[in-house]
Amino acid sequence: MNKIEKIQIPNIKDTSLLVVLDSIELEKTLGYHDLFLLWSPTFQKAGIPVYIVFPDEPNQLKEYCQYYNTYIHYVSDFELIKRLDCIQEKIVFGKKYSVILSKMYVVHNGYLFEEQKRINNKAIKKLYIKALELKFENFIKKNKNSVDIPNILW
């Protein structure tokens, strides 16, 4: 069993995408956020909700994200970021800093299934396909062996 599969996210019951990003005020985070805004209709059509977790205060998120009417859920939960091991200590010129690493996860039945440490179109596509496979796994298993091949194809 993978390390991430042991982490339970009880608040998320459906198959969904969980994204951890740094503060909403950073330029790099805004770039990632824009990428998810582009992917939002695709996830919405598939019925896969996207949860983005920020370390910011809820008021800060509410002010910023009230302009977007998307399928993205904005969450302020620093404890979850710690549980997912997304905080890294860096030393710059002898001074310690905490940096939040951007990561994406597929959540299925309350457990993490897949982790992606890079956020780009290719990585989002990979997790989108994995989420679709998990969401429709029972349908695929049921119909995989029951499909009849027409005699013309023999």
Question: Where are each of the predicted segments found?
Answer:
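Short, flexible active-site-adjacent loop segments at beta-strand->alpha-helix junctions, enriched
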Residues: D56, F78, I87-K90, G110, ...
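Thiol-based oxidoreductase modules, predominantly thioredoxin-like and allied folds used
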Residues: G47-Q60, T70-L80
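Non-globular targeting/processing and membrane-anchoring segments
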Residues: M1-Y32, P41-P49, K62-N69, V99-I100, ...
